[in-house]
Amino acid sequence: MHERYVPADVEAAAQSDWRAADAYRSKEDANRKKFYCVSMLPYPSGKLHMGHVRNYTINDVMYRYLRMNGYNTLMPMGWDAFGMPAENAAMANGVPPAQWTYENIAYMKKQMQSMGLAIDWSREVTTCKPDYYKWNQWLFLKMLEKGVAYKKTGTVNWDPVDQTVLANEQVIDGRGWRSGALVEKREIPMYYMRITQYADELLNDLDGLGWPERVKVMQHNWIGKSFGVNFGFPYELDGEKKLLRVFTTRADTIMGVTFCAIAAEHPLAARLARDKPALQAFIDECKRGGVAEADIATMEKKGVATGFSVSHPLTGEPVEVWIGNYVLMSYGEGAVMGVPAHDERDFAFAKKYGLPIRQVIAVEGETYSTDAWQEWYGDKTRAVCVNSGKYDGLAHDAAVDAIAAELKAGGLGDKQITYRLRDWGISRQRYWGTPIPIIHCPSCGDVPVPEQDLPVVLPEDLVPDGTGNPLAKSDAFLNCTCPKCGAAAKRETDTMDTFVDSAWYFSRYAAPDAQTMVDARTDYWMPMDQYIGGIEHAILHLLYSRFWAKVMRDLGLVAFGEPAKNLLTQGMVLNETFYREDAAGKKTWYNPADVTVSFDDKGRPVGAVLKSDGQPVELGGIEKMSKSKNNGVDPQMLIDHYGADTARLFTMFAAPPEQQLEWSGAGVDGASRFLRRVWAFGFANREALAVRAPFDAAQLAEADKTLRREIHGVLKQADFDYQRLQYNTVVSAAMKMLNAIEGAKGATPAVLRETYGVLLRVLYPVVPHVTFELWKALGYADEFGPLLDAPWPKVDEAALEQAEIELVLQVNGKVRGALKVAKDASREAIEAAAVADEMFAKFAEGRPAKKIIVVPGRLVNVVV
């Protein structure tokens, strides 16, 4: 054992032992409780960031603690390797996405290994490899057979210059990110998955999950189950009588309808735009906008009157039809009723275009005005109908029932349950993804690839150039034979949404070498006992993975219908930001490592200069670490300088796992100093710590009893904190233990050995390298086995018992000292001790005690 703690040497030695023992390979064992903990697999972007370090350390701590407690634990890892960033990097660097991806995986895997993570690498999954995505294709075909997957037209962003489809994030101010061309909306055939078929189950099953309430609410709102009325506004056009159908949850406001708005893609819009160039121009403008719901929600609401009216279904009054850029064809019926008096969006639209505003609900004590929107205008809990004829005086529910009944009687509508959730469109007009296993035959149409011909292998040597899909230009991939008739045919060139890849990877970890999609091992490990990832995945990834599990269950592949029992969403890692702004308002961001900050006398930052030129930079505040703000910390530099254990200790100590973590260089230094103290104590006391003499706890001297009482008391709290995932207070507990052990005067070697061994085991899940090496060097491994599987220390409840307790001594209600009495002292004995105490004599000044108040276990108050 070396005197000085050298992290690089300690960590290399520990990792060498773990590799030699294949320490983290997990096997199924029906006789043991299992614990399957998974971190969301990373995209191989090139390097780990501090968010990765935090996520994987949380997972690792959980794994090690539960393994010490006898669980059969598994922590796997893989790579979410398909996706657009690889294509962008390929275009920038002129290399195939496959090369860029595999090089990044190799580097990031090396970084993970340097962190000492307890990963079973024999289960590694890479989603861009054919042996994985074969099963994406296989399940897609099964879903196609069952009608869960199907084909229909969908709207995409089309770049007319690059001749390619753009993701929503590639459309900037209505233009393509590369070409700058005005983006068009196009309708193209796409494959969808019928997630709406599972909407109610996805909603109801949320109740049984140990997930953060915030995530459950987000999913609940995304699914968006609504109870309302679907009805039509009658109209006649070209000699045909039709209905303009809408859905509303506020049928009680139907008498306040003053206009209807339809989507630019609505069939009625195209018909009404004939011979109306201005109307057609507006439709074209709408189609150039983004297709994302978020874009629609934030953009300026605009509309154009069509000059056409439909009839109000209850009054027969004419209702003007507008085309609105905020109406989505993909939601509801592609049309909405406009009730400006009681819908905030409609109110703003009506004020902008001078449309009538008709109040039809009222709240007692409130006065309606069309001057400005007030929150109560949309209130349905207190509202009653007014200006609504026979419905006047009805509350929301009663009005909806009555109006729905009248619409139904007239054949115009009825009550309906709808969902905000839409079927999952999985077709992507991109190269780097799972090929959709469909063949297009001139005679047979769309033909599924036969199961025996899977996987349809994606060529890995293509380099995208930004003009269309490379697969459509690859004769070797594109041209094939129809499996039905043998004629020349073409392969489908769309690939699957990358959310397909991440929808089930955790099931493949359980059986990575299976010759089927999953096998019995999957039902042993799944569902995950703990899933860990960022809140940004609360909706899409987590919702799709839940849907995928239910589909696999219904196909008889697995026994579970939910992929994760418990979910932890770790907080973001934050850091200071610094910038300079030029005359044009453009900001240049500087990394905190390149800046010197000055502080006031209270430690608050008041200024900063760039180290390279000594000139001032602006303080931008604390924000999430990101490339855009240049405020990241390279984990590899941290590990190289301080060691992985210091990085792990700081990230666990600085904040509870679910809360944001503020980066602190001083905090990292403090973590490093603490580990040096742990090592230094072990080295300085190595001979005493080697003593394995048994002891009778009841016969120990007071110094030993005091140390054991403190250590076992802290151990009890640390064990509780491990169970509730509060790892920051676990580290605090370890620091208290070290302080107690270092400060113990007169403790015997045997008790020092016991208590230091407890400290090492409490710290081990957080800092496995240094504790593993100390455990081995000081002979603990010879007694208990390697720290990997050493049993978790048990609290000695007897050690917590105290012969004496300390009571607060008060004289006339003021604290004057402390009183030590036997734990089982009688009230009379406590009173006698109080009046005999020298502090009582000092403050009583010779006056006798009139009354003595004893609060058992807490205080004694003598009134004079």
UniProtKB/Swiss-Prot annotation:
Gene3D superfamilies in the record: 2.20.28.290, 3.10.20.590, HUPs (3.40.50.620), Isoleucyl-tRNA Synthetase, Domain 1 (1.10.730.10), Valyl/Leucyl/Isoleucyl-tRNA synthetase, editing domain (3.90.740.10)
Reactions catalysed, as given in the entry: tRNA(Leu) + L-leucine + ATP = L-leucyl-tRNA(Leu) + AMP + diphosphate
Keywords: Aminoacyl-tRNA synthetase, ATP-binding, Cytoplasm, Ligase, Nucleotide-binding, Protein biosynthesis
Single GO MF annotation: aminoacyl-tRNA deacylase activity
Keyword Protein biosynthesis: yes
Biological process per Gene Ontology, one example term: leucyl-tRNA aminoacylation
Enzyme class, first EC level, given as a word: ligase
Location relative to the cell: Cytoplasm
Chain span(s) of sequence motif 'KMSKS' region: 624-628
InterPro entries according to UniProt: aa-tRNA-synth_I_CS, aa-tRNA-synth_Ia, Leu-tRNA-ligase, Leu_tRNA-synth_edit, M/V/L/I-tRNA-synth_anticd-bd, Methionyl/Leucyl_tRNA_Synth, Rossmann-like_a/b/a_fold, tRNAsynth_Ia_anticodon-bd
Chief site of localization: cytoplasm
Coiled coil: none
Domain of life per record: Bacteria
Keyword Protein biosynthesis included in the entry's annotation: yes
A Pfam family reported for this protein in Swiss-Prot or TrEMBL: Anticodon_1
Gene Ontology CC: one annotated term: cytosol
SUPFAM superfamilies with a match to the protein in the record: Anticodon-binding domain of a subclass of class I aminoacyl-tRNA synthetases, Nucleotidylyl transferase, ValRS/IleRS/LeuRS editing domain
Annotated EC: 6.1.1.4
Positions of ATP binding: 627
Renumbered ranges of motif 'HIGH' region: 42-52
Family: Belongs to the class-I aminoacyl-tRNA synthetase family.
Protein name, entry field: Leucine--tRNA ligase
